Each structure stands twice: as C-alpha cells, then as structure tokens.
Design a protein with these regions (language model features):
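Membrane-proximal alpha-helical signals and transmembrane carboxylates
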Residues: 1-345
Length: 345
C-alpha cells in the first residue's frame, strides 16, 4: 500500500496544451539578417487552423527568441517534421542555420529538409487552411518524392553529418510553386561543401542519380518515345562496378528493367526486345554522362565516389576532394536488360 506513495511523477513533463507545437520552419535571409517562419496548429471552437509566426534576428537562435515574444504559449519544436530553406540562404554555410537544432535534446533529428525557389511566405500561406499540420503536409510530400526516386532521402541528422564530410556532398529536394500555387518537385539542389552551388538537377536526372547511387525508392521509372510509341520501364535491380585509377573513375551499371508501358505489339519478339534494350542502353548512358558532367561542374560529389577512393585507394585521395572530383575523367557505361515485359510474362 505504501509503494504508490513512494513513486514520483515525471519531473520533466511538458504538456502540449501548454505549448505551441511547431511542425514546420522556414529560413530566409543571411546571418546578421535572418527571417524565420514557424507554423503550428491552433484549435478553435469551429475548426483546426494553422498559425504562422515570423521572427527576425541576427541568427537562428535569436530569431527563435524573437518569435517566442509573439506567441501566446512557448514554442515547442519536439514535433518538428520539415525545415524549408530559401535558395539564397542555402548559398551560405547551411550548417549555421542547423547548428542550434543539434544542441537541444528536445529537438528531433529526423525532420526532412528542402530548398525552395521563390518567396518563403507562399509555402506557409498554402498550409494555413489545411486540416493536417503544415509540417506533416511537406513531410508526406517529400516522402512521396523519395518513394518515386526523384530525390535522395536525407534527414536533419544525415544531412548535418554530410556537411562535415569532405568525401561526399549533399543534395536536397528543390521545390517550387506551380501555376496553381501548389508545391511541385523542381529537381535536386547540388551542394559543394556546406553551400548550395546554385546548380540543380531536373527531376529526370534525379531518378538517374538515385539509380547511380543505388538509393532507389519504391519505384524508379524511365520514360521516352520509341519509334513514335510511348515506352516506360521500371528499374527492378541495379548492379554497379567502380574501377579507380589515378586520374579516372570508370563506372559500369547493369540495369534490370520491367516494361510497364508499350502499346505496340510483338513485345515478346526477341529482336524487338533486343532493339529496345539497345535504345534504353544508349539513352541512359548518354543521360548519365551528361548528369555526371553537371555534378563535376558544380564540384558536387553527390554519390560519394570520394569515400570509395579514400577507403580503397588512399594514395589517390586528396583533402580538397571537390576540386579533384571536378577534374577526373568519370565515364559511365550502361547495360540495360529487360527481365519482364508484362503482368503475366
């Protein structure tokens, strides 16, 4: 009978009803003149709505303090699920805007990150009438891009780690507003070191990067016209072989694909399959090499070739890997094999 009396309560309990639980944050500006947007849900007698608070200051921590002065309750970031960063802001040292989130034990390290094109306010205005939280909306949106192999999955934790890695560079989802003021994927933002280079990959190149990186989501599609007819395939399996020498890294890819769209007849004909395989091989190889040229131009080793060189060919690795990466010959050779042509065969 005495045991319950000896038990103590949770000394660090924090009730959501006493906090403004922020799910989405957006940054724009630069250190010395930072603006941040904080979105959190608020229940009224009629509906659930999203409140957006703007803070200004010289740093992310200062901005947070400024925003706290405008809320009726203390802001709680324990349910933060998405962080948006303007493209101009990301061209500075990105870690300056993330540092404070690693220093508070109550902050999650799993939020999604994305670079946005245009005014930050538009991305927050969109969510004000949503029933779900703002952060949830963008979290699901980015997760959908990951599942379709359009972007490489990164969280606050994994992205933060890469910013300290000198043998691989970060790539983040690049999002813009479409004509109907809805967010849409605009490709991938390429980083070199801790800063956004201003260079991007389009969505088709995003799929190719995921194939090259062997980081496929639920589905990876390649689509084109073949002899005037639509042709679409799903990448089923990727085999990759990398050969390293002092001034060249050769990458060989073997793709096993499944045909998901091809209205023409005779798909079971062996010669037809061979012709399509050659068409896809030429297409993917050409576009892969074009994508690699863009990565090298941006000095952005997005697939971590530097890690492979550092681990297995130490004498070829240089501390300024970004510069070395941009000067290497990196030919990519592709072989596409059709392993399935339809649902039943």
């Amino acid at each position: 009978m005495l045991v319950p009396l000896l038990l103590v309560g949770c000394w660090d309990e924090r009730l959501y009803k006493n906090s403004s639980v922020v799910s989405l944050i957006g940054f724009e500006g630069e250190i010395g003149n930072v603006t941040a947007y904080y979105a959190y849900p608020e229940a009224t007698t009629e509906e659930m709505k999203t409140v957006v608070i703007t803070g200004k200051g010289v740093s992310p921590r200062d901005v947070r303090q400024n925003a706290d002065q405008k809320t009726e309750q203390v802001m709680d970031l324990s349910e933060l699920s998405t962080v948006l960063i303007s493209e101009k802001t990301a061209k500075n040292d990105l870690y300056q805007y993330l540092d404070s989130y690693f220093r508070d034990s109550f902050n999650p390290i799993t939020p999604k990150l994305a670079i946005i094109e245009g005014e930050m306010k538009a991305f927050f205005d969109l969510t004000e009438q949503m029933q779900s939280t703002s952060g949830e909306f963008y979290d699901r949106f980015i997760t959908s891009l990951e599942e379709n192999s359009l972007v490489i999955p990164y969280t606050l934790q994994t992205a933060g780690s890469l910013l300290f890695e000198n043998a691989q560079d970060l790539v983040l989802p690049y999002i813009k507003m479409d004509e109907e003021d809805r967010p849409m994927a605009n490709g991938l933002a390429l980083f070199s070191g801790r800063s956004f280079t201003g260079e991007t990959l389009n969505t088709e190149q995003g799929v190719l990067l995921n194939i090259l990186n062997k980081s496929l989501g639920h589905v990876a599609r390649i689509t084109d016209l073949y002899e005037g007819s639509p042709l679409s395939v799903r990448v089923n399996k990727v085999k990759r072989n990398i050969n390293v020498s002092e001034d060249e890294i050769e990458i060989k890819l073997k793709l096993e694909v499944v045909i998901t769209e091809y209205p023409k007849d005779h798909i079971q004909d062996k010669q037809t399959q061979t012709d399509i395989e050659q068409f896809l091989t030429d297409k993917v190889e050409r576009e892969m090499n074009e994508m690699m040229e863009k990565l090298q131009k941006a000095k952005s080793d997005a697939i971590g070739l530097g890690r492979i060189v550092r681990a297995y060919h130490t004498s070829y690795f240089e501390k300024d890997w970004s510069k070395k990466f941009s000067t290497l010959k990196i030919p990519i050779k592709v072989d596409v094999e059709i392993v399935k042509t339809g649902i039943l065969y």
